[in-house]
Structure formats: C-alpha cells, structure tokens
Amino acid sequence: AFNLRNRNFLKLLDFTPREIQYMIDLAIDL
C-alpha cells in the first residue's frame, strides 16, 4: 500500500507507470 502522507509528492516522478495507474485507480475508488 502507498502511504502518501509519508511521501514527497515530487517523488511521483520516480513512480513507474504501473504504480501511477494503481494510485489513479485507488483515487477513483475513493
């Protein structure tokens, strides 16, 4: 699971497309 509170959002640049898609899917579910 991703804990965005403990992540610097600038590190989104380091995420893989799969991880980005996963977070987008999570956001849609919320």
Curated annotation (Swiss-Prot):
Q: Does the keyword Transferase apply?
A: yes
| Keywords, ordered alphabetically | Arginine metabolism, Cytoplasm, Transferase
Pathway field: Amino-acid degradation; L-arginine degradation via ADI pathway; carbamoyl phosphate from L-arginine: step 2/2
Q: Which domain of life is it from?
A: Bacteria
Q: Where in the cell is it found?
A: Cytoplasm
Q: Which GO terms describe its biological process?
A: arginine catabolic process to ornithine
E.C. numbers: 2.1.3.3
UniProt key word Cytoplasm:
yes
Q: Which InterPro entries match?
A: Asp/Orn_carbamoylTrfase_sf
Which reactions is this enzyme annotated as catalysing?
A: carbamoyl phosphate + L-ornithine = L-citrulline + phosphate + H(+)
**Which GO MF terms does the UniProt record name?**
amino acid binding; ornithine carbamoyltransferase activity
Q: What are the GO cellular component annotations?
A: cytoplasm
Could you say which protein family the record assigns here?
Answer: Belongs to the aspartate/ornithine carbamoyltransferase superfamily. OTCase family.
Tell me what this protein is called: Ornithine carbamoyltransferase, catabolic
